[in-house]
Swiss-Prot record:
UniProt xrefs under PANTHER family: CONDITIONED MEDIUM FACTOR RECEPTOR 1, GERANYLGERANYL DIPHOSPHATE REDUCTASE
Species assigned in the record: Escherichia coli O6:H1 (strain CFT073 / ATCC 700928 / UPEC)
Gene Ontology molecular-function annotations: FAD binding
Alphabetical list of SUPFAM superfamilies matching this protein: FAD/NAD(P)-binding domain
Pfam family, one: FAD_binding_3
Protein name: Protein CbrA
Family classification: Belongs to the CbrA family.
Primary gene name: cbrA
Length: 366
């Protein structure tokens, strides 16, 4: 039975970043259910926007995005829609439009060969015995059993590691549903949609590489019905759909209290969405995945006396920031307050009536 210093379950942005940062410094094994290349197998349903905080993480690490990860077009504002109030406002945002699956595979490709990575693998069982973490997983057609001094759960909303560590912990969850359509809008856009009759979270759309993606986070019980109802409502706001090219769904966490952020125990650690590190106001999680990976890297390499306590303390600033997002979310999803903010026109950028209806080159209008 092979033994490692660190076993990482999940290679989304959080797990991939941590594996890369620990390579050559600790003996690391990493398991991921995505394939190493291509579009077969699991891919994360996601709008695919890289927030400024995530961009800062790449600056800190000296990384630049390859062109095949970046999607077209790049959009500089979010169209915010309040369905019940029939209000639309435009707010400036500095997101980078990316292909999320290509981004995830690129992040994995940065992991050095010194890390033992198993792609297209399935973690079957974990338990702690004799001060070691035992992991049974299936990869390459057969079942394997390894042990590790430290276990890291970077396995997202349905984290097996979190459920093992905190079997009684309950956190609010939604089903995120997305559909892809051929783009029909003359000017591509990114939108954020609020309709409290549909969901007390929010919905979104994004134009990406010739497609129009429409999605949202809805109650688990009847999410599909609510999603369909909202699509019908959006025709009044000039949203154009047609026949769906692809449909996706997954579970998404929605932290609503301080206790929803869980960091781990017994030499097991949680990073990214597995720890509840996701913004309640935007459902953006990549930046917090990268930040929590950097924090855990520092703790593991410094080896303080009580690692779990040190990690919990080190993430306090991050958790406070995310708690602020919970407060912001409550403001945004409160109909009266949201309506007042949007009607005030604060930070709204009106669009000119005669702006070009299609992307054209300067010479085409001469």
């Amino acid at each position: 039975m092979e033994h490692f210093d660190v076993a990482i379950i999940g290679l989304g942005p959080a797990g991939s970043a941590l594996a890369r940062k620990l390579a050559g410094k600790m003996q690391v094994i990493a398991l991921d259910k995505k394939h190493q290349h291509g579009t077969e197998g699991f891919s994360k349903p996601c709008g695919g926007l890289l927030a400024p905080d995530a961009q800062r993480s790449f600056i800190r690490d000296g990384l630049t995005l390859p062109v095949d990860v970046i999607a077209n077009p790049q959009i500089f504002s979010v169209k915010t829609v309040d369905v019940a109030a029939s209000l639309t406002r435009n707010y400036q945002r500095s997101y980078i439009n990316i292909n999320r699956h290509a981004f995830d595979l690129w992040m994995k490709s940065l992991i050095p060969a010194s890390v033992e990575v198993y792609h297209d693998s399935l973690c079957r069982k974990i338990w702690r015995e004799d001060d070691k973490w035992h992991v049974i997983f299936r990869a390459d057609g057969w079942e394997q059993h390894i042990t590790a001094r430290y276990l890291v759960g970077a396995d997202g909303a349905n984290s097996m590691v979190r459920r093992h560590l905190y079997p009684d912990h309950q956190i609010r969850k939604y089903v995120a549903i997305q559909q892809w359509f051929a783009e029909k809008h003359p000017v591509p856009f990114y939108s954020c949609i609020f309709d409290n009759a549909i969901t007390d979270c929010y919905s979104w759309s994004i134009s990406k590489d010739g497609y129009f993606i429409f999605g949202g986070a809805y109650p688990m019980k009847d999410g599909q019905t609510r999603f369909t109802t909202l699509k019908e409502k959006m025709s009044a706001f000039q949203f154009q759909f047609g026949k769906a090219v692809k449909s996706e769904k997954c579970t998404v966490l929605f932290p609503s209290r301080w206790q929803d952020f869980v960091c781990g125990k017994d030499n097991a650690f949680l990073i990214g969405e597995a720890a509840g590190f996701i913004s309640a106001s935007s459902l953006e999680g990549i930046s917090y995945a990268l930040d929590s990976a950097e924090i855990l890297r520092s703790v593991l390499l410094k080896q303080p006396e009580k690692l779990n306590t040190a990690y919990r303390r080190a993430t306090r600033k991050l958790r406070l920031k995310l708690f602020g997002k919970i407060v912001k979310s409550r403001c945004l999803t409160a109909p009266a307050l949201r309506k007042w903010i949007m009607r005030s026109g604060v930070a709204h950028i009106p669009q000119l009536k005669d702006y070009p209806t299609r992307f054209t080159s300067p010479t085409s209008r001469m």
